[in-house]
A protein has these predicted regions:
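… and, occasionally, acidic/histidine-rich disordered N-termini of signaling adaptors
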Residues: 2-168
Length: 168
């Protein structure tokens, strides 16, 4: 029926907006030719996003999972993605960046320690790759870092903190 079509069209339009915030895969491949992206969101729009930005001699990569599914998750992903972009202007240290995002999300969503406060936020793994020093720095909120070294099939896991970004 007409109402169902309007909802579907609206969700498809929201997907185009959400996709526009994702970095182009070709850009990532151009800088990291042996990389790949495994991005399989559950719904047309979702709370999942990946992030990539080259800033000076550093590359920042993130994989994030925001609270909520579908449209509410998509709203959260746009809010969290924007806070990540803003935090990168203030610091290049992954731990500091996550702290800045945490404060920003809590302020934006008016989260307090009260029971009535929303518990929305995100889990994230954030890496900074220093191209000159050939060094990776990582910080994570509930999302660990998985490393597979060249020529190996072994997965090395670096655990994240057991706290999410935002009101948890």
């Amino acid at each position: 029926n007409r109402q169902h079509k309007e909802i579907r069209d609206s969700i498809n339009y929201a997907e185009r907006i959400q996709s526009a915030k994702l970095p182009p895969k070709e850009e990532i491949k151009g800088i990291l030719p042996q990389s790949f992206i495994l991005f399989l969101p559950k719904d047309v729009v979702s709370g999942d996003f990946y992030f990539f930005e080259k800033k000076h001699e550093r590359i920042f990569i993130a994989a994030a999972d925001c609270t909520g599914h579908g449209v509410p998750g998509a709203f959260m992903s746009l809010i969290c993605n924007e806070h990540l972009t803003v935090a990168l202007e203030k610091s290049s240290n992954p731990g500091e960046i996550l702290t800045i995002i945490n404060k920003g999300i809590k302020t934006a969503l008016r989260q307090t320690d009260s029971i009535e406060s929303t518990k929305d936020g995100m889990d994230i793994a954030l890496c900074s790759i220093d191209l000159q020093k050939r060094r990776i720095e990582y910080a994570g909120a509930f999302n660990p870092l998985w490393i597979i070294r060249d020529g190996s099939t072994e997965v090395e896991v670096i655990n994240a903190t057991r706290r999410s970004i935002g009101g948890f």
